[in-house]
Design a protein with these regions (language model features):
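Catalytic DNA-binding helix-loop module of base-excision-repair DNA glycosylases/AP lyases
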Residues: 58, 106-108, 125
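Structural signature of nuclease core domains in nucleic-acid processing machines
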Residues: 84, 94, 109, 116-122, ...
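Active-site microenvironments of metalloenzymes and redox enzymes
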Residues: 1-100
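Short, well-ordered junction/capping motifs at the entry into regular secondary structure
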Residues: 63, 99-119, 175
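Residues within well-ordered beta-strands of beta-sheet-rich folds
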Residues: 80, 114, 189-191
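Short amphipathic alpha-helical segments
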Residues: 96-97, 101, 191-195
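Surface-exposed recognition segments
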Residues: 5-6, 12-36, 118-195
Length: 195
């Protein structure tokens, strides 16, 4: 399943943001340049972790899925756990078998998950770079502008999020962001090789 806040907090408490060995070189530089010490919207006050949510600041829900992390953070966490991020193809196959639990913003959601969370409310980072599918030919007009020019230095996220319109949501829906971005509803799933 998705990495929980509790699981990620172990990484934070173990000095995951102070140890370069689990970070990609570019990620380590980004993290140091921007003084990143925890997921976006987390903060520590009066010996307790809090998180800014869509309904304001609240104590960090340790059982909830982790949200608002960059590719760099996701990759460092996976390395720390002795795992890796799934490929785009692995995650698509996995998501087809999962039950969709939608709770879209338009339906009054105040948080990107609920107690029976499966997928559909958080994007999940993959290790796959955003590149065209085999046989891809750019369309003329606006779609060419949207797809073709962005296939550089971006990583694929899968699964949809609470801000994904129902008409767009499907198991094969791809999103992509630069590896330092973490403002979107992004979470982590881990993968291991069978051998």
């Amino acid at each position: 399943g998705l990495v929980s806040n509790s699981e990620y907090l172990e990484f934070v408490n173990d000095g995951g943001y102070q140890q370069s060995r689990h970070w990609l070189s570019m990620g380590w530089d980004w993290h140091n340049e921007h003084a990143v010490k925890h997921p976006l919207y987390w903060f520590y006050k009066d010996d307790q972790w809090f998180e800014f949510t869509l309904h304001g600041a609240a104590p960090l829900d340790l059982q909830a899925p982790l949200c608002h992390v960059s590719y760099f953070e996701a990759n460092a966490y996976a390395s720390w756990r002795g795992c890796r991020l799934p490929t785009e193809q692995e995650l698509e196959i996995f998501l087809v078998a999962e039950t969709v639990s939608r709770n879209a913003v338009g339906e009054g959601a105040l948080h990107p998950y609920n107690s029976d969370y499966r997928h559909g409310q958080l994007w999940c980072w993959t290790q796959s770079q955003y590149s065209p599918y085999p046989g891809y030919r750019p369309y003329d007009g606006m779609l060419e502008e949207y797809n073709g020019k962005f296939m550089c230095n971006q990583f694929v996220l899968r699964g949809g999020c609470i801000a994904t319109p129902d008409g767009h949501y499907r198991h094969s829906y791809r999103n992509f962001f630069q590896p330092q971005q973490r403002w979107m509803f992004s979470g982590i799933r881990l993968a291991r090789d069978l051998s």
